[in-house]
Swiss-Prot record:
GO terms for biological process: tRNA methylation; tRNA wobble uridine modification. The gene is mnmG. Transmembrane segments: none annotated. GO terms for cellular component: cytosol. The keyword Electron transport does not apply. NAD(+) binds at residues 274-288. SUPFAM superfamilies: FAD/NAD(P)-binding domain (SSF51905). This is tRNA uridine 5-carboxymethylaminomethyl modification enzyme MnmG. Homodimer. Heterotetramer of two MnmE and two MnmG subunits.
Length: 628
């Protein structure tokens, strides 16, 4: 019998990051996937990043993950979304050449130290112990082989009990052309997990040569693409344009006429939730009947392929209806469909079954990441994968603290806290609005926030850590230089600096907080600052712009962390807490919050309930982090 420290099931975005993270920490890791050639497949949109999502990719990269490096090698259309707004909501996004992204990710994974990859299917797992929380002991493969392990990560994507729907046709599949995992859901149910169903969809693909590009609006990317990885100097491939078109009344009439035939509208799927913010075109027509048109982005899927992805018209209508719909759209009158769209439904667990480490509460050593936890999106999956994989490996080390990212230090922390505290009834995706501390959680400073944390957990290479140290030294030197330049009221008048004067002296860093002052203005007045790199100057400008607000946010974060550090013992009996209502007891017992802060975020838990818990813990002297 083979023996591995960590076994990861699934070779998608969550699984790749989980396996690589476990291997980086030092665990002997096995990645089991149905087909090795499908590792890193972009099942839907061939793009990485976006609003909030782009920050997650940079956070994954700051922890030495794979996604940022891979997209930099495969990007063909890069853009910073929300560029006209503040840096706190900038969203780096890159269209990928899918035939470059997938093999690049696959090659990285196949050549990763401490990591073995096999093409197989995990059909069951065993546990040791009959106590309340048994321990993972092995996994069973479809060929009958038993592999011994005490740490298991499920990153099953849409394959867990996956079923595809196109029109009136339904068939088992995790992705078009790939069989689902049908036995694992049974195994999870047998061990007491309650599984729900979610669905998502994808649009048809169009032949590039059948599109009348002259009728469409061109959308160019950034002239100087910004790499995702802090280790990349530039992107590798030539950049191309995307194009914009719209649906129209004729399109909508075709869809309305055939709405009853859409697979996503079949009776068995009506109560299965789809992504709220990425609805199918038939759902858009149903929900927004007054809209005359809906925007479609035509995104080439690569430099050497004819396949074009029409972003915005995910559909599960019958194939002939899909073609009719496409040909009603401006520029697509002669469209040739290379592949039809479809809806896929799949199993997920209630993420409230997880700790913040992404380990399940029911079974010790079992971790989950990605769509199995109710999320949608490559980036959300990658963020969970790196946390689950790292913690699976870290938990093997005696007395080792787990990697728990907080709401105050990362979007990954926001996402995990939302999931394990609130749960979800629909596919969860990240937005900047979900983060209370988004002025701090920016795409430009992900390495400053997380790389040192990653290094402390053996996730980050010496090379990356050294690069961060050099960057911090440069930032510190520039900050000192700016603070050392003092502008008197006379200087402000002499240099024609357009700010309100109150008679006080201001240093150059303080000047940056004024809306009319940017780094370019300071460089004209004090040319000596040009000795610093353009990248360092740009980052410092952002810090200067937000400085007054960041100071206030630091106070908010301090208050937040005080409650996060007030731990609640895992063995607490909420029925023993005096004055706690039955409803509060049930909610707290279901979530099992790790801290007072986490308990406060549970819907329905009142300030009075929190006070009762604090009194109970003080009396019992059971706080593990600090005196309560």
């Amino acid at each position: 019998m083979q023996n591995y420290d960590v076994v990861v099931v699934g070779g998608g975005h969550a699984g790749c990051e989980a396996a690589a993270a476990a291997a980086r920490v030092g665990a002997k890791t096995l990645l089991v996937t149905h087909k090795v050639e499908s590792i890193g497949e972009m099942s839907c949109n061939p793009a990485i990043g976006g609003i909030a999502k782009g920050v997650v990719v940079r956070e994954v990269d700051a922890l030495d993950g794979l996604m940022g490096k891979v997209i930099d090698k495969s990007s063909i259309h890069s853009i910073i979304l929300n560029r006209s707004k503040g840096p706190a909501v900038w969203g780096p996004r890159a269209q990928a050449d899918r035939e470059v992204y997938k093999p690049t990710m696959r090659d990285m994974v196949l050549h990763y130290e401490n990591l073995t990859v096999i093409s197989e299917e995990v059909v069951d797992f065993t546990v040791d112990g009959v106590e309340e929380r048994p321990q993972i002991s092995s996994v069973l493969l479809s060929n009958g082989e038993l592999i011994k392990t005490t740490r298991l990560v499920f990153a099953t994507g849409t394959f867990l009990g996956g079923t595809i729907h196109v029109g009136n046709e339904s068939f088992p599949a995790g992705r078009i052309g790939d069989k689902p995992s049908t036995k694992l859901p049974q195994a999870l149910t047998a061990h007491g997990f309650q599984l729900g169903r979610l669905k998502t969809g994808t649009p048809p693909r169009i032949d590039r040569d059948s599109i009348n590009w002259s009728k469409l609006l061109e959308q160019k990317g950034d002239v100087l693409p910004t790499p995702f990885s802090f280790m990349s100097e530039c992107v590798s491939l030539p950049q191309i344009s995307c194009y914009v078109t719209h649906t129209n009344e004729k399109t909508h009439e075709i869809i309305r006429r055939n709405l009853h035939l859409a697979g996503s509208r079949c009776e068995s799927l009506l109560d299965v939730m789809a992504p709220r913010y990425c609805p199918s075109i038939e759902e858009k027509i149903r929900r927004f009947p007054d809209h005359k048109s809906h925007q479609i982005f035509l995104e080439p899927e690569g430099l050497e392929t004819n396949s074009v992805y029409p972003n915005g018209i995910s559909t599960s209508c019958p194939i002939e209806v899909q073609l009719e719909m496409l040909r009603s759209i401006n520029g697509l009158e002669q469209a040739v469909m290379l592949r039809h769209g479809y809806t896929v439904e799949y199993n997920f667990i209630d993420p409230r079954e997880l700790y913040h480490t992404l380990e399940t509460k029911k079974i010790k050593g079992l971790f989950c990441a990605g769509q199995i936890n109710g999320t949608t999106g490559y980036e959300e999956a990658a963020g969970q994968g790196i946390v689950a994989g790292a913690n699976a490996a870290l938990s093997l080390v005696q007395n080792q603290e787990p990697l728990v990212l907080k709401r105050s230090d990362s979007y990954i922390g926001v996402m995990i806290d939302d999931l394990v505290t609130l749960g979800t009834s629909e596919p969860y995706r990240l937005f900047t609005s979900r983060a209370e501390y988004r002025l701090t959680l920016r795409s430009d400073n992900a390495d400053m926030r997380l790389t040192e944390i990653g290094r402390a957990y053996s996730l980050v290479s010496q090379e990356r850590f050294d690069r961060l140290s050099q960057k911090k030294q440069e930032m510190h030197a520039l900050l000192n230089a700016l603070k050392g330049i003092v502008a008197t009221p006379n200087d402000i008048a002499e240099y024609d600096i357009a700010i309100a004067q109150n008679g006080e002296k201001k240093n150059a860093f303080e000047l940056l907080s004024h809306p009319n002052i940017n780094m370019e203005v300071l460089l004209k007045i004090w040319p000596s600052l040009r000795s610093f790199s353009a990248g360092t100057l740009a980052l410092m400008e952002i810090e200067g712009k937000y400085a007054p607000y960041l100071k206030r946010q630091e106070a908010d974060i301090k208050s937040f962390l005080e409650e996060e550090n007030l731990s609640i013992p895992k063995d607490i009996l909420y029925s023993d807490v005096y004055g706690l209502s039955k409803e509060a007891q049930e909610k707290l017992q279901a979530v099992k919050p790790f801290s007072i802060g986490a308990a406060r975020r549970i819907p329905g838990i009142t300030p009075a309930a929190i006070a009762n818990i604090l009194i109970h813990l003080r009396c019992k002297h059971k706080s593990s982090h600090k005196s309560l």
